[in-house]
Amino acid sequence: MAAPSLRTARLLLPFALLAAWLAVGGFLGPFAGRLGEVSTNDQAAFLPRSAESTRVLTEQRAFRQRETLPVIVVWTADGGGSVRRQQAAATTALASLTRTPGVAGRTSPALPAEDGRALQGVVPLRPDLGGRLPAALDRIRAAADRVPGTTAQLAGPAATQGDLGDAFAGIDGLLLGVALAAVLVILLLVYRSVLLPFLVILSAVFALGLACALVYALADHGTVRVDGQVQGILSILVIGAATDYALLFSARYREELTRHADRFTAARAALRRSWGPITASAATVALGLLALLLSDLTNNRSLGPVGALGIGCALLSSLTFLPAALVLLGRSAYWPTRPRATDGTDSAHGLWQRVAGVVDRSPRTVWASCLVALLACAAFAPTLASRGVPLSETFVDDAPSVTAQDTLDRHFPGGSGNPAVVIADAARLPRVLAAARHTEGVASAAAVSASGRPGAEPLVAGGRARADVTLRSAADSDDARDTIARLRSSVRAVPGAHAVVGGYTAQRYDTLRTAERDRTLIVPVVLAVILVILAGLLRSLLMPVLLVATVAVNFLATLGVSALVFRHVFGFSGTDPSVPLYGFVFLVALGVDYNIFLMSRVREESLRHGVRQGVARGLVSTGGVITAAGVVLAATFAALGVIPLAFLAQIAFIVAFGVLLDTLVVRSLLVPALVRDIGRLAWWPGRLSRRPDVREVPRTPRTADEVR
C-alpha cells in the first residue's frame, strides 16, 4: 500500500489533466457547432489551381465589374402548352429584380425555347452572399412565381449552391448525434460496462471540441478553408479515431489491472506499452492526410491539414484525458465487472483462441482462401467509373435545382445556361468563332458584346475578347466533356489567337484530369509514408511491405464491391473523381492502423515466446478490442450517410465496408496466416528474423478481452 503522501502526489497529475480537459470542453466545446460560421460551400473550391478553366475565370474579371453567380429561371405553362404569351410578364419579373439586394447587374430578358413551351432568364447574383444566398433565392422565386399561368423553377450554379447549403444545414448536431449514438450502442453491447463507454465518448467529444476550435481560428484568419464536406469528415474522423485510440488504451489498461494490484502501476504499464502503436497509428493517418496538400484541388488541400489536426487532437485526448480518468476511477471504470489478477477467461477469449488455432494449424490454406476471395472482389474494381456524376446524381434525394435542370434540358439545348467560355485575342475572334461553330457537339457560338445584344460590337478588354459557346449535350454529361476537348483543339489551332476555354463543363473536365493526376502522385506518397512508419515501429523491412500489400488488396476488393453496390443497389452511374482518392487515404491509413496494433503486439509476444506463439498470442490478445474498434469506426463513417449527398454516401460506404473487411478478414485471418506461414523471415532483417523459434506448450494469455 502506498503511503498517503505518495498516493496524494500520484493523484495530482491525473486531477490536473482532468481539470484541464474539463476546461477545454467547457470553453472550446461550443466551437463544434460554430464551424458553419466560417465555412463556405462555394463550388470554386473544387477547381484545380493550374487548370485552363481556372485561368479563364481569372481573365473573365476584365470583362465585367464583378464576378457573378447566375441563377437560371425557367418557366413552363401550367397546362403544358405554349408560354409565349407570358414572355413579357416573365421579362418584367426579371427586370424587377435588378435592384434587389444580392443581384449583381442587369438581368436578361426571358427567352423562349424553340418549342415555345418554356422560357428562361438569367439573374446574376453576387458570389460572396454566403449565408444570405437563401434569402436572395427566395426573392427571385417570389418574383418568378408572379408570372400567371406558369410554374417557375430555379436552376444554375446559384440554385445548386443553395441546395448544397440546405444539404449541410444542421450538419453539426445531426451528424454528431448519429455518430455518437452509434458508438454508444456498440460500446454498451460489446463491453457490457456502464461507465467506460461514456468515458470513451467524452474523450472523443473533448477531442472534437479542441479540433473544431483550432480549425475555427485558422479558418477565421484565412489559413485553412472549410466547407460542409470538410466539416462533416472532420467530425467523423475525430470521433472515430479518438474512440479507436481510447478503446485500445482502455483495453491495455484493463489487461494490466489483471497483472498489477496497484492501479497507478497498471496505468504506467499500459501507457508504456500502448503509446507507441497508438502514436504510430495516428502519425500514419495524419501524414496520409497531409499528403493531400500535394493535390491541385483546393478542397483536397483543405482536408489535409484540417484532418491531420483532428487526428492530433484525438491522439492527445486519448493519451491524456482518458488515462487520467481511468487511473482516478481504477477498477470501478469497468463496473459492473472489476478486473482482478485472479480473473480467468471467458467465451470471448475462447473465440479468438479458436481462430488462432485454425491459423496456426493451416496457415497456407487460410491465407490462400482469403487472398482468392479478396482478388475475386478486386476484379470488379476497374468497373468503378470515377469520371464524375451528372447533377441529377449529386444529391441522394431530388433537389429543386436538379428538377429545374431537367426541365431546362427538355426544352433548351443541353448546354443552355452553362455555355463554354472562350477568351481569345480580339483580332482573331472571328476565326475563333468559326472554328468553334465547326466543332462537333457545338450548338452555337457568339461573341459577348458590351450591350448584351446579339450581333453588337464585341466587348474587348486588354486586347482580348470573349465568346459564349453553347453545347448540344447537357453540360454535366460525358459527351459535353468530350466536346470541350475537341473545342480546345479547334480554337488552339487558330494562329495567334491564344484561345483558352473555360466554363462549367470545362471546369468539370479539368477537375477530372486533375483528380487522375492527384491519384498518380498522392497514392505512392501515402504508401511510402506508411512503409517508413511501419519499418520504424516493427524494426523490419519485409513486414511493412507485407502489411501494405494486404491493405492495398483490401482497398481494391472494397472498390470492386463498391462498384457493384453503387450500380446495382444504389443506382449510381459513377462517382466523383475524388472518391477513390479519399477512399484510398482513409481506408489504407486506417486499415494499417489495425495491422499496427496487431503486429506490434505480435512482435512483443514473439520477443518473449518465439514467432510462432507470438502470432497466436498477439491475435488472441488483440482480437476482441480491434474488432470492436473496427465496428465502431465503420459505424462512425456510416453516419456520413445522413447527409443527402452522393459523394459523402459513397465515401461512407467505401470506408465502412472496407474497415469491416479489413478488421474481420485481413487483420484476423490473412495477415496472421501469412506471418505464421513465412515464419521468422517475415521480420527480416530485424533480430526476430535471426532468433530460433521457441517451442513450448502455449499457455492461455491474459488479456483485456478475457475479463468481463
Language-model segments: what does each one mean?
Residues 49-70, 78-161, 383-574, 596:
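Structured non-transmembrane domains adjacent to transmembrane bundles in polytopic membrane proteins
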Residues 40-48:
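Short, solvent-exposed beta-strand/turn patches at coil↔beta or beta↔helix junctions
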Residues 1-38, 103, 127-386, 505-708:
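Membrane-embedded transmembrane helical bundles of large multi-pass transporters/channels
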Residues 48, 313, 343-347, 396, ...:
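A general boundary/transition motif marking the beginning of the first structured unit of a protein
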Residues 43-44, 80-81, 299-302, 342-343, ...:
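Short, contiguous strand/loop micro-motifs
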